[in-house]
Amino acid sequence: MVQTKIHSAHNQLDSIIETLCWFLVLITWSVTIIRYPTLPAIIPIHFSPLGEADGFGSKAYIWLYPTVITILHAGLTIINNYPHTFNLTDNSHTQNTELQFKKITKIIRTLKLTVISLFTGTLLYTLLIT
């Protein structure tokens, strides 16, 4: 099967989403580095659906948040840079290929922002209640 390589330019919304993602990654690392020395030895590491802490662990667990966020950001960015490797149906390599690639990359970019925002929110909530 022939893979069509298309590198479409970002529009303004794409650039804003990418900038927000990078900003959130930097915020998670900065806040974690700044707050780590003042954290208690035991911190909440799991929350109930009501937002109440129901699991506790060493303060070293706080490093998982920025690490996971960075890995997710890098992975989704790499995947998004190679839309031609996605498993599209055979009829996708026609006139609408570029449109499909744009839609797919926008979905992945939005997913990246959503996931990073959720992890960042959880980190900030954890730091707020400790």
Residues covered by each model-derived region:
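Alpha-helical transmembrane segments of multipass membrane proteins
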Residues: L24, T28, V68-L76
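Interfacial helix-start motif at the membrane-water boundary
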Residues: E52-L72, I104-R109
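Cytoplasmic juxtamembrane regions at transmembrane-helix boundaries
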Residues: Y82-K106
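Membrane-water interface of transmembrane alpha-helices
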Residues: I34-T38, H73-D90
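Active-site and channel-lining beta-strand-loop segments
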Residues: T32-W63
